[in-house]
Amino acid sequence: YPHILVHNNDKSVILDKIEKEEWARLIFENTKKRLAVYVERHKTNPNWILDRYLMNRVPGKRYTHFVSDRGGTKLVEYKGDAPVPTIRVSSHKRTPITPEGKPYVAPKIEDVIPQDTSMTMNLLNPSTKQFERVDPQQYVSKINREINELAYEAAVLYWLTGDESYARFAADILDQWVNAAVWQYPIEGPGRVGYLDIQTLGDEKSKPLILAYDFLYPYLQEKGYSLKNYDTVFERVAWTLSFRGFATNNWFAAESSTLVAAALSLSDKAKRDYYLGFYLKNDTVSNGCGQLSLPSAAKIWFTPDGHWKEPGGYHN
């Protein structure tokens, strides 16, 4: 470890580049600067960041099963009760929109209520400049993703610097996440729904933590963090992205890096090869959903000169 994006023998090359290349030094220094307040606070108040992770915290409502509507647009039912808080799943595939037709302003991590148990949030209406109580919808995943990305960046900085304050910050977030997600199951619904997000596309928001695990594994072992639940959670991510998500547009391609990261993180070689096979050679498409392997994707979705067969303005 690490073994997905880099290996340990790459570290000296990266550090040399940081020392000699201005662009690399700026990325390194700006990342440290961005993380400094979180990592420093974590030394004396680790619950600050953990309590702002959006979870189902109320006993009796620590949901384990989620059901979407027939179109996979929104959640319509919550079931089960875990012995610990579970990860909140975005209730809708879209961001919340004001009556004036504009997106509400998403709160910063600092503005999230610690250990919030409500299913709604006070969000700023940019038109009226007033806060309104609404369902945060996709902002649930957005907020958690921002915390996931902080953990990933801290894990990389730990690997590069050896500073254990980065490792502890990232490891505590990762530990809370995996021990919550292990109680949860892929959403019940059509082929577009995901595991920890209403859409399979949204499950890529877990990728930063999967990659953080790769950088943190020796630290997690050394400090006695439980590792027993990681394989279960990583396999659920890999399974979801292998057999769900649209294969009739760019979804399968957008999801593939998360699928590969989850598969490469599995400790069982047979399972690792099984899920990697769906990226490398075996299609799983059924009723328009699943994973197209690289050979099929190249044949179906790329022009002879290597262009993706969707219009350039698709995302505008």
Predicted regions and their residues:
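A compositional/structural signature marking long, glycine- and acidic/polar-rich segments
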Residues: 261-316
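Extracellular glycan-targeting catalytic surfaces
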Residues: 1-264, 276-284
